[in-house]
Amino acid sequence: MKKLLFLLAIAAMVVACQPKKKGYTLPDPHDVIMYEVNPLVFAQEGAFNVIASRLDSIRALHVNVMWFMPTYEQGVLKAKDSPYCIRDYKAVNAKYGTLDDFKRLVDLCHEKGMSVIMDWVANHTSWDHVWMADHPDWYTHDAEGNITWPAGTNWEDVADLNFDNADMRLAMIDAMKYWVNEVGIDGYRCDAADFVPFDFWKQAVDSMRAMPKRLLMLAEGKRADHFDAGFDMNYSWDYMNANRNVFQRDSSALILLQTDYMEYDTIPKGKVKLRFITNHDEAAGHSPVEEYGGVRGSIAAFVETIFLRGGALLYGSQEVAYPERLNFFHWKPVNWMSNPEVYNEYKTLLTLYNKYGALKWGQLVAYPAVDVMVFEKRYEKQDFLLLVNVRNHEVSTLIPQEWRGKKVKDMMRDTKKELPSREITLQPYEYFILKK
């Protein structure tokens, strides 16, 4: 008995002395701070290992979900080098690394407190996909019996899948389960979700929900029925487009409040829109620095977009104010050491966003204005007032009545101040995050 107790004591000491492995928790959709990873801005070859070396800088932004753009084997036949032209749903792209490299990267994300979701391209495959030869009936055919690309698009590098085929659906769901079981990922961002039938998404999401672990499911689309299919989040395309109209065409800031209301009025209570000022599609045409009137404009747009409500998305490169377009078909190195003051500003903003529940999902009280986004966020005893000048010139705006003359804390400058009795003046693209 004494020997047994001695051995148990030794075993307990060994366990206690081992370093604790940091865990992660899949965030609630309302708490998501997502980072979109385009491997080709990290390295031309071996991106998995290079991304691993950047995780601390990404995590310092309070990112809790890493979204990897397609990391699958790409097709060659009729291809245009798009990562969304997939040859094998169960194989990694060799130029990024090996399956073991990817597993290590996912494990490292988890150790640092970040969940991982992968891009899932359900709508189409490459023309030389492993299904093509053995299962031509899994694809859409035209009147002459030829396999076609997706209708209504110019995506001639990909072949359209036939969702009337039950076997194809099951094979796809099996492939989706593969990455959860084999690599331990935590969900999917489902590409071109508006192109895919509702009943397939319902079948697929139900199947994923039946797996032992909780998963995050994001639809790249704006159909209201995505939530009926079981998705947690979908895209806030309308808000982004309204934002561009405000910054590029001097539209009234009122349209941002109107668009926010319309987006949330059409989805079930408790569901979440993913908010962003850029992503790989948008940055392929223009960088956010170009789209929003410069670095200061891009940050102002980010502030009113993220703090209004919804999940938050950063596109890798945004945090260093990369000034050029990024064609995601090709390697384009980003200097991660550039513009450290911009990185630090994003870090401060997201630290506040992560720390205060009111700033993420507090009650929204909006004060309509033409040139300034003015809104309050309340939760329990937290009360914040945000003012964002959406113009590249000085603007004065009315202060909400109950904030006039109040002593507040300027959260970005870490100073205390007394607000004026009626109006406040903001410099071009200036913003304030004020706490009572």
Annotate each PLM feature.
Residues I33-E36, V65-P70, I117-D119, G187-R189, ...:
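Structural recognition of the beta-strand scaffold that forms the well-ordered cores
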Residues N181, D191-F276, V295, E304, ...:
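Active-site-proximal helices and loops of the catalytic beta/alpha 8
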Residues L4-M13:
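Sec-dependent N-terminal signal peptides
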Residues G285-Y292:
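Short, solvent-exposed helix-loop connector elements
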Residues D81-K90, G152-A159, S236-R244, N327-W336, ...:
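Short glycine/proline- and charge-enriched loop/turn segments
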Residues W67-A79, D119-D128, D191-P197, E220-A224, ...:
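Short, solvent-exposed turn/loop segments enriched in Gly/Ser/Thr/Pro and often Arg
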Residues Q18-N49, S53-V65, P70-V183, Q203-A210, ...:
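Substrate-binding/active-site clefts of carbohydrate-active enzymes
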Residues C17-W67, E73, V295, G311-L314, ...:
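Carbohydrate-interacting/catalytic domains
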